[in-house]
A protein has these predicted regions:
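Alpha-helical elements of Rossmann-like donor-binding domains used by nucleotide-donor carbohydrate transfer enzymes
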Residues: 4, 8-12, 89-93, 139-142, ...
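A short, conserved alpha-helix in the catalytic core of glycosyltransferases
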Residues: 70-75, 80-108
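A short acidic, glycine-rich active-site loop
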Residues: 122-134
Length: 200
């Protein structure tokens, strides 16, 4: 990210904010660093709201723009969820407080998410480093208990997490570390939930 990108993103934030006073966070259009194609959801349809502004329930926080006043109202990202779903949880919390989130197609950011994208019919998944699966499984089980987390996200991610042990052997030859971190994530997701719930 260079100075020109920052200038453009701040300008876009101010422009979109004028049309949407309840804007919580604005992100760029994220492009796959390898293929230079936009990351998108096969399930959630695009909802453009204004010139170049795409309203979304959650965005990738990389390269995004947010004001300090918004952080005072919504709070900071939940560090208890390190490392996965942190930006998604913040966006859902913002929606709960009456704010909207979205991205602009006037700013683009080349960004590599995980190792590669896996296409699974109507769904897609990201192949990540083995250790990331610990946080994904643990945090998913924790977020299942959070009421403001969208039901569709819980259902689609439940399907992904259940299917992963079956299709990962076909996309990576080093499957054992993946299984180990998945099992650790499930264990801690169940046994440490009370600690997550009670720790502020």
């Amino acid at each position: 990210i260079d100075a020109e990108y920052v200038r453009m993103m701040v300008s876009e934030y101010e422009r979109v904010l004028q049309e949407n006073p309840n804007l919580g966070i604005l992100g760029p259009t994220i492009l796959n660093a390898t293929q230079q194609e936009e990351y998108h959801s096969y399930i959630r349809k695009k909802q453009y709201q204004g010139d170049g502004f795409l309203r979304k329930e959650n965005i990738i926080s990389s390269g995004s723009c947010i004001s300090c006043k918004i952080l005072e109202k919504i709070g900071f990202p939940d560090s208890r969820l390190f490392l996965d779903y942190v930006d998604s949880e913040w966006c859902w919390r913002a929606h709960k407080r009456g704010f909207i989130c979205g991205q602009t197609d006037r700013c683009q950011l080349s960004h590599q998410i995980g190792i590669k994208t896996i296409h699974l019919g109507v769904m897609q998944d990201i192949l990540s480093a083995p250790k990331r699966y610990y946080y994904q499984y643990r945090n998913f089980l924790w977020l299942l208990h959070v009421k403001y987390v969208p039901r569709y996200w819980k259902l689609t991610n439940a399907a992904k997490l259940l299917l992963r042990p079956f299709y990962l052997p076909f996309v990576t030859s080093h499957i054992t570390p993946y299984y180990i971190y998945m099992l650790r994530g499930v264990w801690d997701g169940i046994t440490q939930y009370k600690k997550y719930k009670n720790h502020k």
